């Protein structure tokens, strides 16, 4: 039986990337409690099938609900692309129709119209997100005049997950994909980082990006969207506890997660171990 008491806002990601979403949300909405769950043991999600990503994501969402969350944000583009709609339409009516699961693709698609002059936009993301064409569909729905080009970056998530973001190898893989997307459409003037891991590669991305091309990370736009959502849905906002606390959980090595999280968040964190079901 799920608790009806107010609880933390859940943030789920396949690994460390969702920390960029959590950081953006906490900057804007510091008063709430948060519960972050990283499925590092099964990362990356990008190459996995729709069915597997859906099942892994569903397991995580259910666990976060069991731990008291009434609202869960999928801080993972692959999960948002491959699992969100199925969970919202098929699972939530059975689990608890009063609880909510939100994704992070639409908030970025909503604002991109104000961030491009050329109306040519690039998306750098995982293989799964690019194949799903979720960004193309959302942007075309909201901004039919924008042309979207996407490139998959299969090695970028492992660079972050294995703490190689500052390595010479990172230079090679980042430059390769930046060059590829600019060849694909030289008129691009805004690039969406369609994976929450990618802002952790920002120094490399900026190093190789042509002048005049804007990088669009998602954190601040997701935070703005979440604030508006809570304002529009007071019945959900009242179920989000306000103690300004954060609890971190990982399915892999808590010590490794702690080290990585502290590097990015610039604050000490305590990390707990958690197990999710396996296929």
Features from the language model and the residues they span:
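Non-catalytic structural scaffold of enzyme domains
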Residues: 1-279
